[in-house]
Amino acid sequence: MVAYWRQAGLSYIRYSQICAKAVRDALKTEFKANAEKTSGSNVKIVKVKKE
């Protein structure tokens, strides 16, 4: 048995992005602002100092 997202030709990451967007779009307006703030991704790059 193959997962539906695999049958559609999607990767799991893309499938989860689509699901998350659908959930955020279905939220009531009072909860939407908080969900939009947390939906972004943060990346921190740290350069290692050579001694």
From Swiss-Prot:
Name the family.
Belongs to the eukaryotic ATPase epsilon family.
Q: Which residues carry this modification: N6-acetyllysine?
A: 21, 32, 37, 44
Tell me which UniProt keywords the record has, alphabetically. Answer: Acetylation, ATP synthesis, CF(1), Disease variant, Hydrogen ion transport, Hydrolase, Ion transport, Membrane, Mitochondrion, Mitochondrion inner membrane, Primary mitochondrial disease, Transport
UniProt cross-references to Pfam families, sorted A to Z: ATP-synt_Eps
Query: Record keywords: Zinc included?
Result: no
Looking at the UniProt record for this protein, which Gene Ontology cellular component terms does it annotate, in alphabetical order? Answer: mitochondrial inner membrane; mitochondrial matrix; mitochondrion; proton-transporting ATP synthase complex
Point out residues bearing the modification N6-succinyllysine: 21, 32, 37
For biological process, the GO terms are: proton motive force-driven ATP synthesis; proton motive force-driven mitochondrial ATP synthesis
The name of this protein is: ATP synthase F(1) complex subunit epsilon, mitochondrial
GO molecular function ontology, one term from the record = hydrolase activity
Say yes or no: keyword Repeat present.
no
Matches recorded under InterPro entries = ATP_synth_F1_esu_mt (IPR006721), ATP_synth_F1_esu_sf_mt (IPR036742)
Q: What is its main location?
A: mitochondrion
The record's account of tissue expression is:
Ubiquitous.
The entry's function note states: Subunit epsilon, of the mitochondrial membrane ATP synthase complex (F(1)F(0) ATP synthase or Complex V) that produces ATP from ADP in the presence of a proton gradient across the membrane which is generated by electron transport complexes of the respiratory chain. ATP synthase complex consist of a soluble F(1) head domain - the catalytic core - and a membrane F(1) domain - the membrane proton channel. These two domains are linked by a central stalk rotating inside the F(1) region and a stationary peripheral stalk.
Record text on subunit structure and interactions: Component of the ATP synthase complex composed at least of ATP5F1A/subunit alpha, ATP5F1B/subunit beta, ATP5MC1/subunit c (homooctomer), MT-ATP6/subunit a, MT-ATP8/subunit 8, ATP5ME/subunit e, ATP5MF/subunit f, ATP5MG/subunit g, ATP5MK/subunit k, ATP5MJ/subunit j, ATP5F1C/subunit gamma, ATP5F1D/subunit delta, ATP5F1E/subunit epsilon, ATP5PF/subunit F6, ATP5PB/subunit b, ATP5PD/subunit d, ATP5PO/subunit OSCP.
> Which cysteine pairs make disulfide bonds?
none
Q: Which disease is it linked to?
A: Mitochondrial complex V deficiency, nuclear type 3: A mitochondrial disorder with heterogeneous clinical manifestations including dysmorphic features, psychomotor retardation, hypotonia, growth retardation, cardiomyopathy, enlarged liver, hypoplastic kidneys and elevated lactate levels in urine, plasma and cerebrospinal fluid.
UniProt subcellular location? Mitochondrion; Mitochondrion inner membrane
